[in-house]
């Protein structure tokens, strides 16, 4: 905790390396802000922290073009590039272009991203129906601070997931604030079990022949199967989806957008409704995917921004739903939150920094889900440094998610496969009630599948020129089954929505 606070303070003391086209601008807008014009360039170390991903290090740069400033704080063009890695072996390599001027009267966004993830979170299907037990993966060098008897592996709730994404989206105007949207892209998932030898590094797993105990207690035992491997053995994850696949997609929908700006609106409504058709090929590293993995999903999102006092106090909330309406989506795509425009490095749901802060990343995995985020955004101080405009804000928030389309589990097959696994591999197979919630009759409990997952917290925002927002969020889950830790911090760029 002490290291994290030192890290946050260090970041807050950093000022961007900033260069701009030299134009003496004296105009101010209706809120008294000095208007920016021309090209503005900002570069920063890509440093951050995520409760699920660890500390992040790298570099990022953002170029904005404001033209004559008549639309400020809206930009005409934005070019964003980032390369970074985290201490939990999660990588970000991304280039994004966003423009309202390249094609007259249209908005065009192009994004190319590669995200290697050596320890992607996997907590099973259907939320609370799947048991989360912190003792199974929590390791501490002090044995008194961990459950030695229950401990399995730090990778018990993990699998390896590398993702390549390319997306091109365009928006045009139908009438006033009503827009049409279309997009295409491809998602390439390369999936496997965690590479334990790589994760162990120099801490090789070896057994002392005299004591029969590991010579290095921190080293993970590669013989222990995590939840992902168990789901494959028991048939919950089909072999055709177990190793990933490549998925081209087409998207079309409608948008209503009356917001007065994109990054931090002070008033207005944003709503979208769209369909995404996704195909499947090259699953399992070259094998043809089953036709059933072609699927159609529907998304609806509603955001509302209400000014309670000028631009200093804003009540903002977001409601959303994502459902599968035809075909079958592979398990790894059910944690991908579809969006009309790619603005963040990753859209994952439900759980984690991009959906439900304070709840573990991908804790709620189902065929369909709904969510809500509520924030009270305040600007407590405004000031200038040179020609740059800054503000400091605070934003208490509440996040909620529910399952709308659960997985239909074949309970008889699961029990048969588990019994077979228990007989063949008793040392590394736990009782069924360590994986699923069971009722008094020993059947998988259905009663809590639709129960809400909730979290709350507080955000600190430091913004430059309205569009460049440095964010520090603290959050905690309201149920320990979603996260046993209370100190969950997320240091990112921008608002959640």
At which residue positions do the language-model features occur?
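Outer-membrane beta-barrel initiation region
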Residues: 20-101, 109, 194, 207-266, ...
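Short loop/turn motifs that connect adjacent beta-strands in outer-membrane beta-barrel proteins
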Residues: 21-22, 26-40, 67-76, 102-108, ...
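Transmembrane beta-strand segments of outer-membrane beta-barrel domains in Gram-negative
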Residues: 22-23, 27-29, 111-113, 120-311
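Residues that define the transmembrane beta-barrel architecture of outer-membrane proteins
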Residues: 39-41, 53-57, 75-77, 89-93, ...
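Transmembrane beta-strand segments that form the barrel wall of outer-membrane beta-barrel proteins
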Residues: 40-51, 74-87, 93, 270-281, ...
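Transmembrane beta-strands of outer-membrane beta-barrel pores
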Residues: 49-51, 63-65, 83-89, 99-101, ...
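C-terminal outer-membrane beta-barrel translocator/porin domains of Gram-negative envelope proteins
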Residues: 240, 250, 261-388, 404-406, ...
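Outer-membrane beta-barrel "beta-signal"
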Residues: 462, 485-497
């Amino acid at each position: 905790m002490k290291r994290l606070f030192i890290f946050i303070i260090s970041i807050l003391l950093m000022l961007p390396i900033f260069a701009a086209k030299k134009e003496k601008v004296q105009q101010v807008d209706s809120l008294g802000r000095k208007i920016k014009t021309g090209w503005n360039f900002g570069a920063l170390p890509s440093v951050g922290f995520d409760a699920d991903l660890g500390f992040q290090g790298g570099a990022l740069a953002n170029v904005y073009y404001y033209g004559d400033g008549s639309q400020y704080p809206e930009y005409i063009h934005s070019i964003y590039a980032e390369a970074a890695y985290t201490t939990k072996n999660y990588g970000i390599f991304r280039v994004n272009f966003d423009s309202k001027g390249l094609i007259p009267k249209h908005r065009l966004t192009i994004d190319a991203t590669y995200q290697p993830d050596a320890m992607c979170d996997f907590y099973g299907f259907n939320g609370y129906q799947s048991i989360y037990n912190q003792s199974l993966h929590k390791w501490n060098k002090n044995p008194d601070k961990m459950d030695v008897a229950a401990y399995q592996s730090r990778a018990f709730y993990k699998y390896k997931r590398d993702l390549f994404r390319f997306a091109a989206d365009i928006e045009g105007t139908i009438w006033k604030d009503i827009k049409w949207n279309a997009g295409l892209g491809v998602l390439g998932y390369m999936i496997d079990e965690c590479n334990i030898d790589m994760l162990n590094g120099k801490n090789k797993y070896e057994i002392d022949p005299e004591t029969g105990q590991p010579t290095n207690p921190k080293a993970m035992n590669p013989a222990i199967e995590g939840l992902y491997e168990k789901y494959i053995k028991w048939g919950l994850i089909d072999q055709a989806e177990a190793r990933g696949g490549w998925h081209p997609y087409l998207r079309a929908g409608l948008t209503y957008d009356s917001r007065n700006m994109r990054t931090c609106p002070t008033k207005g409504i944003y709503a979208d409704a769209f369909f995404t058709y996704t195909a499947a090929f090259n699953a399992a590293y070259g094998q043809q995917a089953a036709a059933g993995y072609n699927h159609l999903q529907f998304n609806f999102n509603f955001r509302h921004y209400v000014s309670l006092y000028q631009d200093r106090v804003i009540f903002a909330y977001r409601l959303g739903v994502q459902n599968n309406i035809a075909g079958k989506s592979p398990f790894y795509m059910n944690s991908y939150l579809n969006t009309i425009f790619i603005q963040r490095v990753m859209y994952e749901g439900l759980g984690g920094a991009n959906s439900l802060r304070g709840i573990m990343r991908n804790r709620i995995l189902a065929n369909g889900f709904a969510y809500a985020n509520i924030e009270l955004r305040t600007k407590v101080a405004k000031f200038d440094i040179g020609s740059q405009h800054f503000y400091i804000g605070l934003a208490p928030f509440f996040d909620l998610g529910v399952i709308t389309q659960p997985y239909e589990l074949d309970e008889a097959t699961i029990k048969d496969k588990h019994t077979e696994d228990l007989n063949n591999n008793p040392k590394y197979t736990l009782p069924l009630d360590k994986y699923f919630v069971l009722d008094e009759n020993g059947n998988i409990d259905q009663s809590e599948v639709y129960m809400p997952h909730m979290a709350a917290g507080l955000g600190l925002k430091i913004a430059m020129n309205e569009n460049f927002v440095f964010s520090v969020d603290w959050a905690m889950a309201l149920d320990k089954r979603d996260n046993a830790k209370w100190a969950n911090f997320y240091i990112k760029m921008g608002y959640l929505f």
